[in-house]
Swiss-Prot record:
Residues 40-59 are annotated as: Disordered. It comes from Fowl adenovirus A serotype 1 (strain CELO / Phelps). InterPro entries: Parvovirus_NS1_helicase. This is Uncharacterized protein ORF13. Pfam families: Parvo_NS1. GO terms for biological process: viral genome replication. It comes from the Viruses.
Length: 339
């Protein structure tokens, strides 16, 4: 019997395709022998890959998930409006004169004003009621404090501008409780008084310096207690409150508590300046003609920039030292250190 070449090739192919029969352990041995027969470099490569993958899994488990955008929402239009009104110093309905006011519903307008009253309320220090510094670093680098309205005012009255800024900064922080500005009715003292009052929308003015009943009614609601055109000396109890003390008083058969309240006083009688000497009080003399001083159009920003450039040293006198009449050691040493 003869066999053709095609039949021979078919028989060889069939023979190769038939799986090897045998017990299961023979297949395991064959697999084990096949792995052991691999070169050593191949086995090391596989082991290193497996260890590397496990290290990557450990590192991946330590990396926090990417936060969802909903966890950090952008500032809402209402928050932006509150911040804008805060910078402008708005806390009352009558102060809100922007065109956008009529586009906001009444109930949302009330919510905005309530948020502003909390930021300007008596529980906040005066320094925190000023707008924060602008993020424009280029403007800050080229800012000239000599162009500041408050700095020019103090320099024109004979004070070292930066040293006076330190005293006002301490007053804003609450380290000093009362700021007294001495000068006539048409002097720069009243101009500075007006500018400082305009910086704080919840500052309340009173006409009776020694009325404890009036102070008791105003203090719980005022961020700043203001007294213009004062022409009488404070009595002992008023001096006690000027120091920043809180006290409980009884008047007209009523007992009431008066909290510590920052004060701003315009003393119109220069002969009474010494009567305002007390702890935690600073007195400035500003007798220049107000007509020679330009108006301050942005008092909140001007005051913020003024105290931001304050000197490190502080005058130790209640009647603040002038440039030509320095009485305390820090003020005497300041020009020597600058030379």
């Amino acid at each position: 019997m003869t066999t053709t070449p095609c039949a021979l090739s078919y028989a060889r192919t069939k023979e190769c395709s038939v799986p090897a029969r045998g017990p299961p352990h023979a297949m395991l041995v064959t697999h084990h022998m096949t792995y052991n027969s691999l070169p050593q470099c191949t086995k090391r490569r596989r082991e290193s890959q497996s260890s590397l993958s496990s290290e990557e899994e450990q590192i991946a488990s330590c990396i926090p998930d990417t936060p969802s955008p909903c966890l950090f929402p952008s500032t809402s239009p209402m928050d932006q409006l509150v911040e804008r009104l805060f910078v402008e110093g708005v806390a009352h309905e009558v102060q809100w004169n922007f065109p956008s006011k009529n586009l906001i519903p009444t109930y949302e307008r009330e919510r905005v004003l309530e948020a502003l009253k909390e930021r300007f309320g008596p529980g906040q220090s005066l320094i925190n009621q000023l707008p924060s510094e602008e993020p424009d670093t280029l403007k800050a680098a080229f800012y000239n404090v000599c162009d500041n309205w408050f700095h020019q005012m103090m320099e024109a009255e004979g004070y070292e501008g930066k040293v006076a800024a330190n005293a006002i900064l301490r007053w804003l922080r609450g380290e000093l409780n009362t700021l007294v500005l001495c000068g006539g009715r048409l002097s720069n003292a009243k101009s500075l008084f007006n500018a400082l009052c305009a910086c704080f929308p919840l500052a309340i003015s009173d006409s009776r310096i020694n009325s404890i009943l009036s102070l008791g009614e105003i203090a719980p609601h005022a961020s700043l207690y203001c007294l213009p055109f004062v022409d009488e000396k404070p009595d002992p109890l008023m001096l006690h409150f000027m120091e920043g003390n809180a006290a409980t008083c009884r008047l007209n058969k009523k007992t009431f508590h008066i909290p510590s309240t920052p004060m701003l006083i315009h003393c119109a009688d220069l002969s009474l300046a010494n009567e305002f000497t007390a702890r935690n009080t600073v007195v400035f003399f500003l007798t220049g003609d107000h007509t020679k001083t330009p108006p301050c159009y942005h008092p909140r920003k001007e005051l913020r920039d003024f105290v931001a450039n304050a000197a490190a040293c502080a005058c130790l006198m209640t009647l603040h030292c002038k440039r030509d009449n320095k009485l305390c050691n820090p003020c005497i040493r300041t020009p020597l250190q600058n030379q």
